[in-house]
């Protein structure tokens, strides 16, 4: 949003009723939005963020699958794995020491029965953002990113053939790749304790025929 505070003051709603505002999306790209009410860091740490994709006027080239993934964190008074209701820890937030990392608002999201799916030969497009406070080292285990639109810019040419990329806090990217081999592929923050121990992991399940020309055991 091009305007003071990104429209924050125009959307502060009190007891006198709803508010609305209008803006023109003039720049194509992948953008993060978040809460702007005090205490802003606390609200963001509790999931008040999301992604907006502004397509170019001519539209986007077609792909077979599109997915949106947002990384964030949770700061709890309890330790990792502690059961029951977990109260928010302002101390951990100020120390920038999250208890958990999450995709789409929960740990181990998009895994198992919630995994995202594609077929061999599909062209996959992913919009990935970091809504909260800690940058992400985004990586797909077993896949190379064919095209990376760094910082979510859709008006700049993509970077080709990328293994891992950094997404800043409050930033986003778009990636495209073709899946050649069936199986399960993990989407992770490659600071791997965040994925393996703290929850920043998702699963892309690819179905279809084997492709021994690309991948096979000996």
Model-based region annotation:
Residues 1-218:
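Copper-binding active sites and cupredoxin-like electron-transfer domains
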């Amino acid at each position: 949003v091009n305007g003071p505070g990104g429209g924050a003051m125009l959307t502060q709603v009190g007891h006198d009723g709803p508010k609305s505002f209008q803006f023109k999306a003039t720049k194509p790209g992948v953008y993060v939005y978040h809460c702007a009410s005090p205490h802003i860091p606390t609200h963001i740490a509790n999931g008040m963020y999301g992604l907006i994709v502004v397509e170019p006027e001519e539209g986007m080239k077609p792909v077979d699958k599109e997915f949106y993934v947002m990384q964030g964190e949770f700061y709890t008074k309890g330790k990792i794995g502690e059961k029951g209701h977990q109260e928010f820890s302002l101390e951990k937030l100020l120390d920038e020491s999250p208890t958990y990392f999450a995709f789409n608002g929960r740990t181990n999201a998009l895994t198992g029965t919630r995994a995202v799916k594609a077929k061999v030969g599909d062209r996959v497009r992913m919009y990935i953002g970091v809504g909260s406070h800690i940058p992400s080292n985004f990586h797909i285990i077993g896949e190379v990113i064919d095209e990376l639109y760094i910082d979510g810019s859709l008006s700049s040419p993509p970077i080709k053939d990328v293994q891992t990329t950094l997404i800043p806090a409050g930033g986003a990217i778009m990636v495209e790749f073709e899946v050649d081999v069936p199986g399960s592929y993990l989407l992770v923050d490659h600071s791997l304790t965040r994925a393996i121990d703290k929850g920043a992991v998702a699963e892309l399940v690819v179905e279809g025929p084997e492709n021994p020309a690309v991948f096979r055991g000996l």
